Curated annotation (Swiss-Prot):
Source organism: Neisseria meningitidis serogroup C (strain 053442)
GO cellular component: cytosolic large ribosomal subunit
Domain of life: Bacteria
Keyword Ribonucleoprotein: yes
GO terms for biological process, alphabetical: translation
UniProt record similarity statement: Belongs to the bacterial ribosomal protein bL19 family.
Protein name as it appears in the record: Large ribosomal subunit protein bL19
Role noted for this protein: This protein is located at the 30S-50S ribosomal subunit interface and may play a role in the structure and function of the aminoacyl-tRNA binding site.
Entry-linked Pfam families: Ribosomal_L19
Residues that span the membrane, as ranges: none
GO MF term set: structural constituent of ribosome
Record key words, sorted: Ribonucleoprotein, Ribosomal protein
Keyword Ribonucleoprotein part of the UniProt annotation: yes
C-alpha cells in the first residue's frame, strides 16, 4: 500500500462514519446538513441509488428521485461532513451496477423489484 492510500485509510478511520451497506437499486434516505444563514438544519433526500463509485475517501453515489413530475439526481460524497446519515429504506433487485437507463423511463416502467431475503430450506 502506498503512502497516499495509507493516509486515506487513516482519514477514513478518523472520520468513524457509520455507513450502511447499500447498492444500486436500493431506496435510501440521505440526511444532509444544510446551512441557511446562521441556522443549520437536516434535509432528507429520498430516492433510488442509480450509481456508486468506490474510490476510498473519494467514494460517491448518485441518488435519483422524481420531484413534481421531474427527475432530479444528486451526487453525494460518501465521507462528506455534510452527509449526516444514510438510511436504507428498501433493497432493490437489479442486475446492473449503473442504472442510468432509469433516466429514460417513467411511471411503472421505472419501478424496481424488491430484493427478498433468501429462503431457508
Amino acid at each position: 500500500m502506498n503512502l497516499i492510500q495509507q493516509l486515506e485509510q487513516e482519514e477514513i478511520a478518523r472520520l468513524n462514519k457509520d455507513i450502511p451497506e447499500f447498492a444500486p437499486g436500493d431506496t435510501v434516505v440521505v440526511s444532509v446538513r444544510v446551512v441557511e444563514g446562521t441556522r443549520s438544519r437536516l434535509q432528507a433526500y429520498e430516492g433510488v441509488v442509480i450509481a456508486r463509485r468506490n474510490r476510498g475517501l473519494n467514494s460517491n453515489f448518485i441518488v435519483r428521485k422524481i420531484s413534481s413530475g421531474e427527475g432530479v439526481e444528486r451526487t453525494f460524497q460518501l465521507y462528506s461532513p455534510t452527509v449526516e446519515k444514510i438510511e436504507v429504506k428498501r433493497r432493490g433487485d437489479v442486475r446492473r451496477a449503473k442504472l442510468y437507463y432509469l433516466r429514460g423511463l417513467t411511471g411503472k416502467a421505472a419501478r424496481i423489484k424488491e430484493k427478498l431475503p433468501a429462503r431457508k430450506g
